[in-house]
Amino acid sequence: MSTTPLALARTFLFVPADRPERHARALAAGTGGVIVDLEDAVAPERKASAREGLVASFAALPEAGRQRLLVRINASGTPWHDDDRAAVAALVGQGLIAGVVLPKAERAGDLQRLAEAIGPQGQLVPLIESAAGLAAVDELAAAPQVLRLAFGNLDFQADVGLACDADEAELVPVRLALLLATRRAGLPAPIDGVTADWRDLQRLAADTARARARRGGFGAKLCIHPDQVAPVHAALGPSADELAWARRVIDAIRSAGGGVVSLDGRMVDAPVVRLAERLLALDAQPPS
C-alpha cells in the first residue's frame, strides 16, 4: 500500500484548469491534494486553451506543491480525451504533476492506456460515477498505477436515476462496494464525493461523518471550495480519545514485549495494534 502524501491525504480540492491564478491559491489552502479540472469546470470552447496553459502555470509552482497536483482529464470517448491524455503524459514526464484523475471510469483498459502514456511514475485515480463503473470496480482498483478509488456521488445518482435525500442512504451499498474493492486491491482508503453546497457547513459535517474511516471506510473527501478543506481534514482525523487509546495500546504492547496483552479488560492482539498504529499514522499527516 502506498504511503505517499496523496495516499494519506484527507482532502482533494478541485480548481478549474482555465483559472491559473487559482492553482497556487489552491495549494496554499491546506488541502492534501489539488485536482486541476479539465472536465466539468471548463467549457468546451475553452478546453484546448486551458490544456495548453497548464505547463506554464505548473512550472511556476513550488516543486513540493507539484507533488500534490492531479489533473482531471475528460472521459474516455469524449472529443478531448486523447489530447488530454497526451498533455498529462507530458506533464508527468516533466515532473509537473503527480498523476491523473479519470472521470466516468468504467473500463480497466482505459486506465491501462493512461498508465502506459504517463509512465510508471504517474499515479491514477479512477472516479466511479456510473453503474458500469461500479460493475467494473474490482478491475479498476486492480489496474496499474491506481493510487486510490474516488466516488462521484452526484454523477452516480444521475446515471442510475436516483434522487437521494441529504443522507444519501441509497448510496450506502455503493460506498461499501468501493470500500471492499479498495481492500481487495490493497489500496489506501477511498475518496468520498462532494458536498455541493459549500456554504452549508452543517451538511458538510454530516457528509464527512458518514464517510469517516471508522464508519464508512472512506479516508478522504473531494472538496469544491477552500472553506471545506479544514473542517473535512479535522473530521476525517482521529479524535483526542482515539489517539489517547492508540498510544496506550502501543505502550502496553511494548511493555509486554509483543504478543497478546489485556488493556481495560479487553484483549489487545495484532489487529488491535494495527488499528492503533493506523490512528497514529493518520494523526501524523498534517494539512499541507
Language-model segments: residues:
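Expand to "…catalyze enediolate/carbanion chemistry for C-C bond making/breaking, isomerization
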Residues: 1-288
